[in-house]
Design a protein with these regions (language model features):
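Surface-exposed, active-site-proximal loop segments in enzymatic domains
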Residues: 1, 24-30, 173-175
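Aromatic- and acid-rich polysaccharide-binding/catalytic face
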Residues: 9-27, 73-101, 161-167
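Alpha-helix boundary/N-cap detector
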Residues: 28, 32-39, 65-68, 105, ...
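Aromatic-lined carbohydrate-recognition surfaces of secreted/lumenal glycan-active proteins
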Residues: 1, 16-19, 44-71, 84-93, ...
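A substrate-binding/cap region within the structured catalytic cores of diverse enzymes
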Residues: 7, 11-32, 41-43, 49, ...
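Substrate-binding cleft of secreted/luminal carbohydrate-active enzymes
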Residues: 85-98, 120-202
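Acidic (Asp/Glu)-rich catalytic clusters
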Residues: 2-12, 41-49, 74-82, 108-118, ...
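Distinct, well-ordered alpha-helical segments
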Residues: 2-3, 63-78, 99-111, 135-145
Length: 202
């Protein structure tokens, strides 16, 4: 497998996530997909001991049921002798800002539930509008996300900044001059903003 080949080349895989395993399907197929995810996570755990394994999911973002699928997933993995470490929520900030199917309060509800299952919670930080518009718009949208957490002094265990849109159009350099916003610059400024807001959180 590709994972085994990576290990043979000396690559250490610290994190591995199943992408949209239970959300990129019709609602009536979610239960069967959860069962498949349970098998996959258990199998991955055997091949990657020491690797933190989890799920990237968008069911809350789509306004679909998520609590029972998450509970079923975690219980199934543990019952099968495997381990699951995190759930990362795929939720562009535009979706949360709109408040239609998901909101920032809903995201915090998901976070609390994931913690109640004994897992770490992560938020994928991206902007659909910004990613389709410009590097600068993506930067500004993503940099506004920490403000949603500063006032109540809480934040997810993991923030994951990514884009599958045309913007940012470049990844480097992180020290790009004023008016340029490659992905690494956005990530660095985001991390600094978090460090200033939460100095005791590593």
């Amino acid at each position: 497998s590709r994972i085994q080949k990576m290990s043979e080349y000396g690559v250490t895989v610290s994190y591995a996530a199943l992408q949209s395993e239970i959300s990129k399907c019709p609602p009536e197929e979610v239960s069967a997909r959860v069962d498949q995810a349970i098998r996959d996570i258990i199998e991955f755990g055997k091949k990657m001991p020491g690797t933190k394994i989890g799920l990237i999911d968008a069911n809350p973002t789509k306004g679909r049921p998520w609590q029972e699928p998450y509970r079923h997933l975690v219980q199934g993995v543990r019952a099968g002798g495997g381990h699951i470490d995190f759930i990362h929520l795929d939720c562009p900030c535009d979706a949360a800002n709109s408040g239609r199917r998901v909101s920032w309060e809903k995201i915090k509800e998901v976070e609390r539930f994931v913690h109640s299952l004994g897992l770490h919670f992560g938020l994928i930080c991206t902007s659909a509008d910004g990613g389709k518009t410009s590097d600068e718009r993506f930067y500004k949208d993503v940099m506004a996300i920490p403000e949603r957490y500063v006032k109540d002094r809480t934040c997810p265990d993991h923030f994951i900044i990514m884009s599958w849109y045309p913007h940012p159009s470049r990844s480097l350099p992180e020290n790009a001059p004023e008016g340029q916003y490659p992905m690494t610059k956005t990530s660095l400024h985001f991390a600094r903003k978090l460090a200033n807001a939460f100095p005791n959180k590593s």
